[in-house]
Amino acid sequence: MTLSTNHVYPVIWHNGAVSLIDQTRLPNEYTFVEIHRSEDMARAIKTMIVRGAPAIGVAAAYGMYLGAREIETSDRHEFLQNLDKVAQLLGSTRPTAVNLFWAISRMMKVAKETLGTVEDIKQTLFQTAQAINVEDLQTCQAIGDNGLTVLPASPEKLTLLTHCNAGALATAGYGTALGVVRSAWREGRLERLFADETRPRLQGAKLTAWECVQEGIPVTLITDNMAAHCMKQGLIHAVVVGADRIAANGDTANKIGTYSVAIAAKAHNIPFFVAAPLSTVDFELADGSKIPIEERDPTEIYQVGDTILTPEGVDFYNPAFDVTPAELITAIITENGAIAPGELVKLQLKQLV
């Protein structure tokens, strides 16, 4: 894959290892972490060195290959048993992002169906991981361009709002929600992006704003509780967010706070779009009520650096995601086009590999 200096690539295979942009250090430090072992990849996913559902999927695919590379046996049955343990390790890291499980499942399926020696299986797994990487980049570019077809026709230059980071950092490159933003900017349809800071980990402030600055896209950062006010003031023409898991009926799990933004958008008659690849759709879930919601360490809420923000004796609740009901979503923008949430099931066959 040829890398462009204009875009960010958070997951790169280089010299026999995976190079990850350390997203926990942005925007102050732009550094890479080299991953050589599956255990290290699992830790990187868990600690959010790499994050964003599609990027997690790509990282997990490479993690499966790294795990396969570590298995020292020529016996096919023993190899597959050990590879299943690698799959379980990676699958235990982030419960909400369905792309993680999609990538692991695809890699396991390839391993079981590949004929030949264990070394043949390992080589095929590597090729599959690289294919998943390239496919996601192409998918994001298609999502971005498909988003142009459903954005409001007027005004000519739009002000969009996004929540969290569904950009190049959250994918193989280009982004889903920010893919739409990038395409709108490229075509002269974007005036400005408003970015929610996205408490408690501040992905909007640290990551989305950083991406926009790198490419010269005008961006205004607001706190999460300013979104409804900005809508009331007529500052927002449409909302575009990403997704970590979408149920068959269109209910969408995304970063905590997305549901609040969707409610505000509905109240102000502002279109609310979800941009995500079909690999993010979990057709086995009829609706969003069964989507597992990750709960993270409460230190994300009460501590910034070495500073404690709250008094002792306070209890904390820190869900990482919420579920936006399908009826609040104007359209879901996929690589196969933009569709109403209720029509999502019609694309199920196109998701199959």
Swiss-Prot record:
Its EC number is 5.3.1.23. Substrate binds at R51, G52, A53, R94, Q203, N254, K255. The active site is at D244 (proton donor). Pathway: Amino-acid biosynthesis; L-methionine biosynthesis via salvage pathway; L-methionine from S-methyl-5-thio-alpha-D-ribose 1-phosphate: step 1/6. The record marks C164 as: Transition state stabilizer. The keyword Amino-acid biosynthesis applies. It catalyses: 5-(methylsulfanyl)-alpha-D-ribose 1-phosphate = 5-(methylsulfanyl)-D-ribulose 1-phosphate. Keywords: Amino-acid biosynthesis, Isomerase, Methionine biosynthesis. One of its GO terms (biological process) is L-methionine salvage from methylthioadenosine. It is an enzyme of class 5 (isomerase). It holds the Pfam family IF-2B. The keyword Ligase does not apply. InterPro entries: IF-2B-related (IPR000649), IF-M1Pi (IPR005251), IF_2B-like_C (IPR042529), Initiation_fac_2B_a/b/d (IPR011559), M1Pi_N (IPR027363), NagB/RpiA_transferase-like (IPR037171). GO terms for molecular function: S-methyl-5-thioribose-1-phosphate isomerase activity. Belongs to the eIF-2B alpha/beta/delta subunits family. MtnA subfamily. NCBIfam families: eIF-2B_rel, PRK05720.1, salvage_mtnA. Catalyzes the interconversion of methylthioribose-1-phosphate (MTR-1-P) into methylthioribulose-1-phosphate (MTRu-1-P). HAMAP family: Salvage_MtnA. This is Methylthioribose-1-phosphate isomerase. It comes from Nostoc punctiforme (strain ATCC 29133 / PCC 73102). The gene is mtnA.
